[in-house]
Amino acid sequence: MSITPPFLLACIDLRGAELTATQLRATLPRGGADVEAVLPTVWPIVQAVAECGADAALEFGALFDGVRPPTVRVPDAALDAALAGLDPDVRDALQVMIERTRVVHADQRRTDVTTALGPGATVTERWVPVERVGLYVPGGNAVYPSSVVMNVVPAQTAGVDSLVVASPPQFTSGGRFHGLPHPTILAAARLLGVDEVWAVGGAQAVALLAYGGTDSDDCELAPVDMITGPGNIYVTAAKRLCRSRVGIDGEAGPTEIAILADHTADPAHVAADMISQAEHDEMAASVLVTPSTDLADATDAELAAQLRTTVHRKRVVAALGGRQSAIILVDDLEAGVKVVNLYAAEHLEIQTAEASRVASRIRCAGAIFVGPWAPVSLGDYCAGSNHVLPTAGFARHSGGLSVQTFLRGIHVVNYTKTALKDISGHVITLAKAEDLPAHGEAVRRRFAR
């Protein structure tokens, strides 16, 4: 295939190559953010907020964002006003998104299970929700009410008692946001029944969620037990630094899409889907894996054509031209499956003949979109699936945000005297084998008299 200006997408030809895991890890495109590099910058922010609370968080917000709200907590009146002023079409779409997401996540809720190992011997696994959760919703290039839905719905379904949404205060030359998070974010929170929203963003938001503090009006800002939600590299670094104090959902990097396609795919669809993810930011990854050189050439031409009318063209061109994006040529679909399993994309589309059969062979992906009528954009909004997904290859060992994220499994052990006596000899033997005699003695003494 040939790459023609102005398009800059790289071509990686793996035809005839030995597709070992080591070689693929070295060859496949992946940008990613160097979180380690910003830890020294973020650590003083976390320390300052841990020591000084809301005052420090607000000061950092004024320094980085140029706006300082009077209080961290958004007043109820502002939430009500945001919902009242929400465009009716947007409200209807959000309501549909919420309903569909609730339906899917309701089926994820685990039930307690009791296992009997003999008369009087049971182990019950109880699923208990995290008590208080902080949900981070970023600002930046776009407004993300969908992220409010995707974080809040599984937490509510899990039974989390206390939720707080944190999102950066917005500033415009006209001052129309008055130092509050974007009104669409506030409206989405209100639609979901969330009444605690903090006007704070960035690393300082993560630190304040982790350590808590006192607001400017002397109201308590209680710390959370877990923080979820995507953000930029500084947010990710702060989550890493705070994870010894709170649980986190993971470290989200730039968004990514991989498309495994053959000659049956429509190049216009493939190109549109690659552009749709590239418009997130300049570090977004768009990767096409195909055995068809005809599709590769046609997709390249479609990308060039569609870029002429793309609204965020500069951002998209930068993302598609970055080292994280490429068209990858493989010998056949068998090789393509091997490549995408190793790549472990956040979003993986299967646009091939017998797409469902091919999809059944995928073991590593944040989410899989099967066939020509399931674009990633559907999953971003109204499929019912969750769009908070592992990036940077983390799908090899982690899954996306779900109801389980907010649940803790607790084993409840219940044995009668007879049941313990029946197994006591094995307990004492194993304790002796591990040179932990007091363990065995704790059992033996119960039957000494």
From Swiss-Prot:
- UniProt keyword list: Amino-acid biosynthesis, Histidine biosynthesis, Metal-binding, NAD, Oxidoreductase, Zinc
Enzyme class, top EC level, equals: oxidoreductase
Q: Which GO terms describe its cellular component?
A: cytosol
Which Enzyme Commission number(s) are listed? 1.1.1.23
Q: Which InterPro entries does the record cross-reference, listed alphabetically?
A: Ald_DH/histidinol_DH (IPR016161), Histidinol_DH_CS (IPR001692), Histidinol_DH_monofunct (IPR022695), Hstdl_DH (IPR012131)
Where does the source fall among the domains of life? Bacteria
The record's catalysed reaction(s) read: L-histidinol + 2 NAD(+) + H2O = L-histidine + 2 NADH + 3 H(+)
Q: Coiled-coil region(s) at which residues?
A: none
Binding of substrate occurs at 255, 277, 280, 347, 380, 434, 439
- Keyword Amino-acid biosynthesis carried by entry: yes
The UniProt annotation places Zn(2+) binding at 277, 280, 380, 439
PROSITE patterns given in the database record: HISOL_DEHYDROGENASE
Outline what the protein does.
Catalyzes the sequential NAD-dependent oxidations of L-histidinol to L-histidinaldehyde and then to L-histidine.
Which protein family is it in? Belongs to the histidinol dehydrogenase family.
Q: Write down the NCBIfam families for this protein, in alphabetical order.
A: hisD
The molecule here is called Histidinol dehydrogenase
